[in-house]
């Protein structure tokens, strides 16, 4: 499932690239995450609300209104059944699927992306990746001359963190402790201004979306923990 902000729609596509279909929506989608097999949560550019959308019917099952600013990145924690939503770029609202806010986490930076993995929260600004507990306490932060314009974060279930670097035009994988990293993909691999990434744990594949040419790449990866 992909967002196509320029055309105001969601794109549903099989992992092998076949059976592509579209869900037209009335706003420009920004962030998206899976709730279950049939439902995704979507935020919108300049929007102060979240839609829960049934991907089979294209219908909106719930609208969650948010106060405090426009919504940005979004991540759903299946373990806690809570949504983590960037609001106003400098805070994270933690809420249930009815929109009840459980807590608000503050960030010292303007956040570009967000991801949750079991009991860990990751977010980024343009040049740093932060690893926190679910109360927002920073465990480690990572920066490197190879990253400029972090736009998306994904994890592989064994602690590695994958990021897209928009201006550096590459994909970086960071070790579980944040001490080491590896440049995994570059322009030579077809990476051109990447804006989204997803690590599919079921088949060890990595999906990377380019902004400038609209190409979605599917790479096979070997999931192995980088050294700490």
Regions found by a protein language model. Name each.
Residues 1-228:
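Eukaryotic scaffold repeat domains enriched in small/polar residues
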């Amino acid at each position: 499932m992909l967002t196509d902000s320029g055309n105001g729609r969601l794109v549903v596509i099989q992992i092998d690239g076949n059976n592509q279909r579209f869900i037209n929506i009335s706003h420009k989608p920004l962030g998206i995450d899976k709730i279950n097999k049939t439902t995704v949560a979507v935020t919108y550019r300049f929007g102060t609300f979240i839609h829960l959308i049934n991907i089979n019917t294209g219908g909106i099952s719930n609208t969650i209104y948010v106060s405090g600013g426009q919504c940005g990145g979004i991540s759903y924690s299946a373990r806690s059944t809570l949504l983590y939503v960037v609001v106003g770029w400098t805070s994270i609202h933690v809420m249930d699927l009815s929109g009840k806010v459980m807590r608000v986490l503050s960030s010292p930076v303007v956040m570009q992306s967000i991801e949750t993995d079991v009991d860990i929260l990751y977010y980024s600004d343009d040049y740093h990746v932060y690893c926190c507990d679910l109360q927002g306490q920073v465990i480690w932060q990572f920066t490197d001359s190879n990253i400029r314009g972090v736009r998306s974060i994904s994890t592989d279930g064994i602690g590695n963190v994958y990021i897209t670097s928009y201006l550096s035009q590459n994909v970086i994988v960071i070790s579980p402790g944040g001490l080491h990293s590896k440049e995994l993909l570059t322009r030579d691999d077809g990476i051109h201004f990447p804006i989204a990434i997803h690590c599919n744990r079921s088949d060890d594949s990595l999906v990377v979306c380019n902004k400038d040419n609209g190409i979605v790449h599917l790479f096979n990866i070997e999931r192995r923990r980088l050294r700490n």
